Amino acid sequence: MVPSILILLSVLFWPFGGYAQTTFYKDKTIRLVAGTPAGSVYDLYARMVAQFIGKYIPGNPNVIVQNMPGVASMVAANYIYTVAKPDGLTIGSIQPALYFDQLVGRKEVQFDWKKFTWIGNTTVSDYLLYMRSDTPYKTVEDIRKAAVPPKCGAEGTGSSAYYLPRLLEETIGAKFTVVTGYNSGTDVDLAVERGEVQCRAFTIAAFFAREPFATWRKKGFVHVVVQTGKKRDAKLPDTPTLPELMDRYKTTESNRRLAAVILAANEIGRPIIGTPGIPADRVKILREAFIKTVSDAELLDDAKRKRLDLDPVSGEELEKLGNEIMAQPPDVIERMKKLLGT
């Protein structure tokens, strides 16, 4: 008798669950808040997801992109966390290293990194630091020995353009002056062209994805002095990795641990997040739709045309990583405060 009742109940209520999933997003619009300016590589990845994800969400909602740049995506992250409704209709694309700012206690932070809804990551990419070729800084050793350190440009402390030069100082003794306050990576590149600064750190993927870098490489305007991967990227076979340099300069174990925490941002990559508190069934819908989106044949062709690498990570994996990186002991946090100048 009991099994029969259970079967009847499942038959009666199962369709309504499926119906609710299908109808919630029907005739709705999902807004993807991009924390970087239009045209940046982060923005290109966000728009690519927005273009295709709607067809994999039951109800086929419209998906629009709203750019909200500022302070290395801090403005967008704070907005998604504190203003957007937790209904699954606002998602976002932010830079991956904003957890630094929470760990070191910056007052601008209005979010709890662990409480974001993690939907997925389009790609994992290591970092590089490029240098104008008409400077005397041809190698890391030149930078280490320089009486006057090179100037690198950066948006804010949560951008790789800021923290990678600082990490190189801590781990291998290469000194830099980092000039912050630029609105975007593109603005930093323009500053490099004008001669205001000589260098910038950011992802390998972006360096090989768009202009002006293809033209710069052809003209020899810049060269890459270091990359952060465990092994050399196939596109940069002659550029030393940070692990190689740490071995060469006998970096301490403490500094190697610091590097591991900082470079965890590589694994977070180009994340798509949601507000805290999205109902579990909608989180499931968004995560499943993301995985289907980054496997879509049309999207893969589009990514290839735009020279955008794909190495996706699931929302579940991102959530686990986010929890792990926030569980840092006090000594590591103090080292990060020193590195970030807080």
Regions found by a protein language model. Name each.
Residues 31-47, 70-72, 153-160:
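Extracytoplasmic "Venus flytrap"
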Residues 26-30, 218-221, 225, 247-248, ...:
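An extracytoplasmic/periplasmic, membrane-proximal ligand-sensing/linker region
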Residues 3-15:
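Bacterial N-terminal signal peptides
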Residues 45, 49, 71-74, 88-101, ...:
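Ligand-binding clamshell of periplasmic/extracellular solute-binding protein-like
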Residues 111-122, 175-181, 212-265, 314, ...:
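Short beta-strand->loop
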Residues 96-108, 162, 166-171, 194, ...:
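A ligand-binding cleft/hinge motif common to bilobed small-molecule-binding domains
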Residues 30, 55-60, 79-90, 98-196, ...:
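Hinge/capping helix and adjacent helix->loop/strand transition within the periplasmic-binding protein
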